């Protein structure tokens, strides 16, 4: 006698609306140029998975995800000492929450990650005869908070405070040019 196994898999994905909003302003106030932009994104998803073995539910899984992003940047600039001075701020906030539950084939997961980045910067550029000079500085504060089942995991929740300089000089005359620059680049670990 042979046992017969009928195995059926079904997945149901619940989709909803993704939301995106953008605001932008570019204008002048006296000698000051103002450039502002902001973005907001929101997304969520829900997926049910069921695997049947001879009409018995053998594997059930439920996956839910919710994420949002807000980002904004403001740059203000004006002439200063025969050059151009600009300063501004930049902010980014992300929030993602993933919940995965099932009936015993692997561990449940409830992961939540939030990240905030605040930055302030200033830049000055000036042309002197055949030279163009530029210098700037940026301060950046980055805070990441990672939670498993509502408990903050300190080892995966770093905070960074960085000062990032930029220096550049270029020369151009009679079709010849030369450039020298220094920039400190920051590479953050990936998170997903």
Where are these regions (language model features)?
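Active/binding-pocket-proximal capping segment
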Residues: 137-142, 152, 183-187
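Outer-membrane beta-barrel signature, preferentially recognizing the C-terminal barrel domain
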Residues: 10-16, 109-115, 155-159, 163, ...
């Amino acid at each position: 006698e042979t046992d017969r196994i009928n195995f059926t898999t079904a997945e149901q994905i619940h989709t909803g609306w993704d939301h995106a909003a953008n605001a932008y302003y570019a204008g002048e106030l006296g000698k000051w140029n103002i450039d502002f932009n902001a973005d907001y994104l929101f997304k969520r998803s829900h997926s049910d998975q069921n695997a049947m073995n001879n009409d018995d539910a053998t594997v059930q899984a439920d996956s839910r995800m919710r994420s949002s992003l807000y980002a904004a940047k403001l740059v203000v600039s004006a002439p200063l000492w025969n050059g151009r001075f600009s300063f501004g701020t930049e902010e980014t906030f992300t929030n993602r929450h993933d919940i995965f539950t099932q009936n015993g084939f692997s561990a449940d997961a409830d992961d939540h990650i939030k990240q905030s980045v605040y930055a302030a910067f200033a830049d000055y550029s000036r042309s002197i005869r055949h030279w163009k000079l530029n210098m700037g500085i940026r301060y950046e504060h980055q805070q990441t908070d990672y939670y498993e089942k509502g408990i903050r995991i300190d080892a995966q929740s770093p905070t960074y405070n960085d000062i990032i300089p930029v220096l550049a000089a270029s020369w151009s005359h009679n079709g010849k040019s030369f450039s020298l620059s220094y920039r400190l680049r920051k590479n953050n670990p990936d998170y997903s």
